[in-house]
């Protein structure tokens, strides 16, 4: 069964509802320019209230390794999602301490080939935008298909919502799906009906 990550969590109510609805992971965005930014202090207050076996993921964009690891330890993260232009050497350095998920923006086949350079890590494919994710826009999922089996753990993101997630999963066969804007009432606040429907459709329940 595909795993589901609800990203852009900014409050405890949304985090707990996501988990109770069947989310496998929640994501905190530590990129200050994001509309869904959360401070490490607020993220920690949410993290410590979550039940065990829920994956806590921190999203960073072109951040210093020491800062990433400090925040990861403080917030009690299980993984970090590197959503910028991080070179593979930096990813490997951080991966010595915590699980790394490398996000790559996709707009054409060359981007898929670039993503393959990171396939030693779980790779998240997102729609390429200047804002580094959270755009609500999809990319052409068929670009993935010739390369699908070269990714060990593929996470699909970018414009997913309750209406299209099932067809995306059926086409791409990802290990996990990641959603943020597709289940929002507005940036930073989730729509609970959308979360419930998204998870139900993703998991085929």
Curated annotation (Swiss-Prot):
EC identifiers of the protein: 5.3.1.24
Catalysed reaction equations from the record: N-(5-phospho-beta-D-ribosyl)anthranilate = 1-(2-carboxyphenylamino)-1-deoxy-D-ribulose 5-phosphate
GO terms under biological process: L-tryptophan biosynthetic process
GO molecular function annotations of the record: phosphoribosylanthranilate isomerase activity
Amino-acid biosynthesis keyword on record: yes
Involved pathway(s): Amino-acid biosynthesis; L-tryptophan biosynthesis; L-tryptophan from chorismate: step 3/5
Keyword field: Amino-acid biosynthesis, Aromatic amino acid biosynthesis, Isomerase, Tryptophan biosynthesis
Top EC class of this enzyme: isomerase
Record keyword Amino-acid biosynthesis present: yes
UniProt xrefs under InterPro entries: Aldolase_TIM (IPR013785), PRAI_dom (IPR001240), RibuloseP-bd_barrel (IPR011060), TrpF_fam (IPR044643)
Family: Belongs to the TrpF family.
Protein's name in the database: N-(5'-phosphoribosyl)anthranilate isomerase
Organism: Thermotoga petrophila (strain ATCC BAA-488 / DSM 13995 / JCM 10881 / RKU-1)
Protein's gene: trpF
């Amino acid at each position: 069964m595909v795993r589901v990550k609800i990203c852009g969590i900014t409050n405890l109510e949304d985090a707990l509802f996501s988990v109770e609805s069947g989310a496998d992971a929640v994501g905190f965005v530590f990129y200050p320019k994001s509309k869904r930014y959360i401070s490490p202090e607020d993220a920690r207050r949410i993290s410590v209230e979550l039940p065990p076996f829920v994956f806590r993921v921190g999203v960073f964009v072109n951040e210093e390794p020491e800062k990433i690891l400090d925040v990861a330890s403080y917030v009690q993260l299980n993984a970090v999602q590197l959503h910028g232009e991080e070179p593979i050497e930096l990813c490997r350095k951080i991966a010595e301490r915590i699980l790394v998920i490398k996000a790559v923006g996709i707009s054409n086949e060359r981007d898929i080939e670039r993503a393959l350079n990171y396939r030693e890590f779980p790779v998240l494919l997102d729609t390429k935008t200047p804002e580094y994710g959270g755009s609500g826009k999809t990319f052409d999922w068929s670009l993935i298909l010739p390369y699908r089996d070269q990714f060990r753990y593929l996470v699909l993101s970018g414009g997913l919502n309750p209406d299209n997630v099932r067809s995306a999963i059926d086409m791409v066969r990802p290990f996990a799906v990641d959603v943020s804007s597709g289940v929002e009432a507005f940036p930073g606040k989730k729509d609970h009906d959308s979360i419930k429907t998204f998870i139900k459709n993703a998991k085929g329940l």
